[in-house]
Amino acid sequence: MAEISDLDRQIEQLRRCELIKESEVKALCAKAREILVEESNVQRVDSPVTVCGDIHGQFYDLKELFRVGGDVPETNYLFMGDFVDRGFYSVETFLLLLALKVRYPDRITLIRGNHESRQITQVYGFYDECLRKYGSVTVWRYCTEIFDYLSLSAIIDGKIFCVHGGLSPSIQTLDQIRTIDRKQEVPHDGPMCDLLWSDPEDTTGWGVSPRGAGYLFGSDVVAQFNAANDIDMICRAHQLVMEGYKWHFNETVLTVWSAPNYCYRCGNVAAILELDEHLQKDFIIFEAAPQETRGIPSKKPVADYFL
């Protein structure tokens, strides 16, 4: 059991927001790949479970989330993507979640967000952070390879469909999602792209997305999809909501946002959704971790001046 104790040590280190060695990242990603490759594009998840939205590298707020929601493995978690970018601690955030996944594979489910992509992370911070913290892009490469193995969606008790963004005009059934070859960079268009990029909109049918990827989808589209797949609701993340969660279309779509005071300046609260074994819902609202518990670095860490 040397591997488990190694992993437990790494988890403790990461919980303290301390980096693990590049060689340890390589080994962790290799183990994660073995687990993730077995998961479905529509990963089955059993209740009770706590569902979480975007985290975006806000490590101390992820610790706050675990403080209010309970730790892994006591609490069963589903994270709906966007672990990295924009926050100061994308590396520690993603590696902690990945280490927990390897240690407790049945107690934490990670699905892919639009930021789990090589192209997006080169623009929004994760690439630069890996380079700064490890002195090379190797760790970024290991992590982005793992992104390709993450599930595209999850289904809780066959009734609640969870996806990062939303629906696609190319997809009417969950079986169609199951046939996608997900082990690739997020494409610029098509069903896999849409699942990670789309947003609900107070309209009917499909609309052009201002994001430049995915679509806007209306209440009629949701009603058809939910009926065709015998599901009660769609749970998704992807959009900042100031109250932490927001219902759409007569409670058939739910947005959950789990990064409080987003980008350290938006002033929003965050939420997680607790589902019991009967799928009864309980929202936990939380605020950003108190200032004194987080060493927020200056925008440009000191190391840069000496490199």
Swiss-Prot record:
Record note on what altering L307A does: Unable to dephosphorylate 53BP1 and KAR1, loss of DSB repair activity
Main location (coarse class): cytoplasm
One Pfam family it belongs to: Metallophos
Record's protein name: Serine/threonine-protein phosphatase 4 catalytic subunit
Effect in UniProt of substituting R107E: Diminishes interaction with PPP4R4
Reactions catalysed: O-phospho-L-seryl-[protein] + H2O = L-seryl-[protein] + phosphate; O-phospho-L-threonyl-[protein] + H2O = L-threonyl-[protein] + phosphate
Keywords, comma-separated and alphabetical: Acetylation, Cytoplasm, Cytoskeleton, Hydrolase, Manganese, Metal-binding, Methylation, Nucleus, Protein phosphatase
Residue numbers binding Mn(2+) 1: D54, H56, D82
Gene3D superfamilies assigned: 3.60.21.10
